[in-house]
C-alpha cells in the first residue's frame, strides 16, 4: 500500500539529512560526556553510574584522570530512551551513505523506472513492517523496538540493493553493446549481497535463539526471502552471461530461464505465504487493522500461487502439443527458407515447421503458443488438442489479471470481459460478521448490451476508408458493427473476409432506384434535339422533366447517404435505436412525399397550360403525362431499331 502523503512530503536531501544526523549524534555524545564527567555534582547520579559500571571495577578508581571512556558513553547512550533513537538514526544514515557509494561505483545515475521501483519497494516495506511490529508482535519495551528497527534497516538495505540489481540486469540484458565490466560490477555486488544474507542468517540464529522460537521463525523467514531473491537474480545473470559467451543460438536458454523463474517464484510465494500464516496465528486473529492487512496479503499470495501453477500447466500442455504436432525443420528446409525468425529476428540454426510452412525457433514458438494458438506470420489457426480448454483457462487467467483475452483466429471477438470480483468472508474474522460477494462485470458482446455510438462508428469507418478507399463505406460500417475494433476490421479487409465489389457496384448499392430517372431525361433530351417541329410539346416538357428529376436526385441522394451515415447500418441491435431510426425514416419519407407532391403539382399545372390550347378536349393532366411518356418510349424504340 503506497503512502501517497509520505511520497509527497518534502523530504530533505541526503546531504542535509547527513548533516542533521551528524549534528544530532555530536550533540548526544557531548551531552552524555558531560553527564558522565560530573560524578561529584549530585549524590544520586554517581550511584546510578557506578551501578551501571559494576562490571568495570577500575572505572570508579580514576574518575578524573582521563574522563569517561568511549565504552561508558556508548553504554550511557544505549541506556537512555531518547539518545538510543539518535543511534538508530545514525545507523540508518550510515546505510544510506553506503547505498549512495554503491550506486556511484556500480550503477551510476539511476533511471526513472529504477527510482520509482526503489521508492515503491521502500514505502511498502516500511508500511508492512510497521504493521508487523505494532500489530503482530505488539512490542512493549524500547529495547525490542530498537532491535527490530535495526534488523529491518539491514533488511530494507538488502532488499533495495537486490531490486536495483534486478532492474539493472533487465536493462543490461536487452542491450547488445553492454561492456563486460558493467556485468562484472553488478554480479560482484550480488555476490556480496548473498554473503551479507549469510551473515544475516548467523545473526538470526544467535538473536532469535535467545528470544524464543517465534522470533527465530520470523527472522529466518525474512532472511530467507531476501536470500532467495538474491539467488534468483544471480542465476538469471549466470544464464545470460553463458548465452553471451556461447557461440551461435542457445536453444535451451528459454527452458532454463523458465524453470529458474518457476522454481524461484514458487519458493518465494510459498515462503511468504507461510510467513503470513505464522503472523496471523501468532498475532491477534480477531478484527483488527493488522489482521485485515494480513488477510488481504494472504489472499493475494494464494491467487499468485494458483496463477503460477495454472501457467505452468499451460506451459507443459503447449510444449507437449508442440513436440507432438510440429516437426523439427530439416537442414534442407532451413536452407530453402533462408530467413530469420519472424518473432525474435535472429538467424535459425534449428527451428520447428508449422503446417502452413513457416519456421520459428523452438523457444520463440513456445512463448507465442502460450498466448495464442495461431501462426505468428499468416494467422492460420493451429488445431491443437484441447484448444477450447486452453482458451478458457487463458481467459480465466486474464480475468484474474484484469486483462483482455487475445481475439481468436477468425478475427471476431467472442467476448471481451473486464471482471472485478470482490469477496468478503466475515466468518473468518468473527461469527457475527456477514459474508458477501460483489462482482462488477463489463461485457461487450454482439448480442450484448449497449452498442457503440454512431459517431464513434462513423469515425472508425472514415479512418479505415482512408487506408482502403476501394472498400465501400457501408461494408466497412457493417463489419465495424460486428467487430467494434479498427484493428480487427483492418485484418478482415487484408485477409479477404470482406468481399470488395467492383467500383460500379458501389453506386448501384447506394442508390439503385436513381439510375432509371437519370436515363429518362437524357434520352428525352436526345430525342428533343432530333425531333421535328410537330413534336414541340415533348421538346418543351423534357427540359422541365430533366430539371425536376435532377432536383429529385440532388434531394434524394445526399439525404440517403447522410441518413445511412447517421443510422450506422440497415438494422440495429438496440430496440431504442431501431425505434428512433423508424421515426426518423418516417419523417424523411413524409418530407420526400411532400416534395414529390409539390413537384408533381407544379408539373401538372405547366402541362395543362401547354396542352389546353393545342388539345382542347383532353384536359386531364394524368392522361397528358401518360401520352407524353408513351411517345417518348416509342421514339426510343424506333431509335434503337434504326441504329
Swiss-Prot record:
GO molecular function: BAT3 complex binding; identical protein binding; protein-folding chaperone binding; protein-macromolecule adaptor activity; signaling receptor activity; ubiquitin binding; ubiquitin protein ligase activity; ubiquitin-protein transferase activity
Result, substituting residue 356 to A: Decreased palmitoylation. No degradation of HMGCR
InterPro entries: AMFR_Ube2g2-bd, CUE, Znf_RING, Znf_RING/FYVE/PHD
Renumbered residue ranges of the record's region VCP/p97-interacting motif (VIM): 622-640
Comp. bias (Basic and acidic residues): 564-579
Key words, A-Z: Disease variant, Endoplasmic reticulum, Hereditary spastic paraplegia, Lipoprotein, Membrane, Metal-binding, Neurodegeneration, Palmitate, Phosphoprotein, Receptor, Transferase, Transmembrane, Transmembrane helix, Ubl conjugation pathway, Wnt signaling pathway, Zinc, Zinc-finger
Domain CUE: 456-498
Record EC number: 2.3.2.36
UniProt-recorded name of the protein: E3 ubiquitin-protein ligase AMFR
Phylogenetic placement of the source organism: Eukaryota, Metazoa, Chordata, Craniata, Vertebrata
Gene name of the record: AMFR
Amino acid at each position: 500500500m503506497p503512502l501517497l502523503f509520505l511520497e509527497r512530503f518534502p523530504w530533505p536531501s541526503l546531504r542535509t539529512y547527513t548533516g542533521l544526523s551528524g549534528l544530532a549524534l555530536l550533540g548526544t555524545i557531548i551531552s552524555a560526556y558531560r553527564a558522565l564527567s560530573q560524578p561529584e555534582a549530585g549524590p544520586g547520579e554517581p550511584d546510578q553510574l557506578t551501578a551501571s559500571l559494576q562490571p568495570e571495577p577500575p572505572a570508579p578508581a580514576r574518575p578524573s584522570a582521563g574522563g569517561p571512556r568511549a565504552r561508558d558513553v556508548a553504554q550511557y547512550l544505549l541506556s537512555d530512551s531518547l539518545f538510543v533513537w539518535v543511534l538508530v538514526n545514525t545507523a540508518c544514515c550510515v546505510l544510506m551513505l553506503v547505498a549512495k557509494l554503491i550506486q556511484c561505483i556500480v550503477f551510476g545515475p539511476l533511471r526513472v523506472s529504477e527510482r520509482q521501483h526503489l521508492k515503491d519497494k521502500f514505502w511498502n516495506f516500511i508500511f508492512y513492517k510497521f504493521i508487523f511490529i505494532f500489530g503482530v508482535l505488539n512490542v512493549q519495551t524500547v529495547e525490542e523496538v530498537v532491535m527490530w528497527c535495526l534488523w529491518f534497516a539491514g533488511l530494507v538495505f538488502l532488499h533495495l540493493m537486490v531490486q536495483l540489481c534486478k532492474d539493472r540486469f533487465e536493462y543490461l540484458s536487452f542491450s547488445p553493446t553492454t561492456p563486460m565490466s558493467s556485468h562484472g560490477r553488478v554480479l560482484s555486488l550480488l555476490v556480496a549481497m548473498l554473503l551479507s544474507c549469510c551473515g544475516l542468517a548467523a545473526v538470526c540464529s544467535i538473536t532469535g535463539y535467545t528470544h524464543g522460537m517465534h522470533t527465530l521463525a520470523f527472522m529466518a523467514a525474512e532472511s530467507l526471502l531476501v536470500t532467495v531473491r538474491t539467488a534468483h537474480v544471480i542465476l538469471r545473470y549466470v544464464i545470460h552471461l553463458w548465452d553471451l559467451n556461447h557461440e551461435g543460438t542457445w536453444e535451451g536458454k528459454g527452458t532454463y530461464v523458465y524453470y529458474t523463474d518457476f522454481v524461484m517464484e514458487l519458493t518465494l510465494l510459498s515462503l511468504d505465504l507461510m510467513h503470513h500464516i505464522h503472523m496471523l496465528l501468532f498475532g491477534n486473529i480477531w478484527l483488527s487493522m493488522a489482521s485485515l492487512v494480513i488477510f488481504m496479503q494472504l489472499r493475494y499470495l494464494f491467487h499468485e500461487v494458483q496463477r503460477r501453477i495454472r501457467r505452468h500447466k499451460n506451459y507443459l500442455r503447449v510444449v507437449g502439443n508442440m513436440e507432438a504436432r510440429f516437426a523439427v525443420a530439416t537442414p534442407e528446409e532451413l536452407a530453402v527458407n533462408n530467413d530469420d525468425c519472424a518473432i525474435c529476428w535472429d538467424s535459425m540454426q534449428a527451428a520447428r515447421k508449422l503446417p502452413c510452412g513457416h519456421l520459428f525457433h523452438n523457444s520463440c514458438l513456445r512463448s507465442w503458443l502460450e498466448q495464442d494458438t495461431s501462426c505468428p506470420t499468416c494467422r492460420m489457426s493451429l488445431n491443437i488438442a484441447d484448444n477450447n480448454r486452453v482458451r478458457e483457462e487463458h481467459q480465466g487467467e486474464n480475468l484474474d489479471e484484469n486483462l483482455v483475452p487475445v481475439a481468436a483466429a477468425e478475427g471476431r471477438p467472442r467476448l471481451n470481459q473486464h471482471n472485478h470480483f470482490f469477496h468478503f468472508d466475515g466468518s473468518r474474522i468473527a461469527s457475527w460478521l456477514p459474508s458477501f460477494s460483489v462482482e462488477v462485470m463489463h461485457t461487450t458482446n454482439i448480442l450484448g448490451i449497449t452498442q457503440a455510438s454512431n459517431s464513434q462508428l462513423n469515425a472508425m469507418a472514415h479512418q479505415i476508408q482512408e487506408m482502403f478507399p476501394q472498400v465501400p463505406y457501408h461494408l466497412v460500417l457493417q463489419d465495424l458493427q460486428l467487430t467494434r475494433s479498427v484493428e480487427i476490421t483492418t485484418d478482415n479487409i487484408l485477409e479477404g473476409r470482406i468481399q470488395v465489389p467492383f467500383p460500379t457496384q458501389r453506386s448501384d448499392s447506394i442508390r439503385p432506384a436513381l439510375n432509371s430517372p437519370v436515363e429518362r431525361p437524357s434520352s428525352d433530351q436526345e430525342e428533343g434535339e432530333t425531333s421535328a417541329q410537330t413534336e414541340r410539346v415533348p421538346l418543351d416538357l423534357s427540359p422541365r422533366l430533366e430539371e425536376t428529376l435532377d432536383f429529385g436526385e440532388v434531394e434524394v441522394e445526399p439525404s440517403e447517404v447522410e441518413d445511412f451515415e447517421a443510422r450506422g447500418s440497415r438494422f440495429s441491435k438496440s430496440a431504442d435505436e431501431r425505434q428512433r431510426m423508424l421515426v426518423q425514416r418516417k419523417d424523411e419519407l413524409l418530407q420526400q412525399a411532400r416534395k414529390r407532391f409539390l413537384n408533381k403539382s407544379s408539373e401538372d399545372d405547366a402541362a395543362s397550360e401547354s396542352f389546353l390550347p393545342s388539345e382542347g378536349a383532353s384536359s386531364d393532366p394524368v392522361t397528358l403525362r401518360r401520352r407524353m411518356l408513351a411517345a417518348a418510349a416509342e421514339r426510343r424504340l424506333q431509335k434503337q431499331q434504326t441504329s
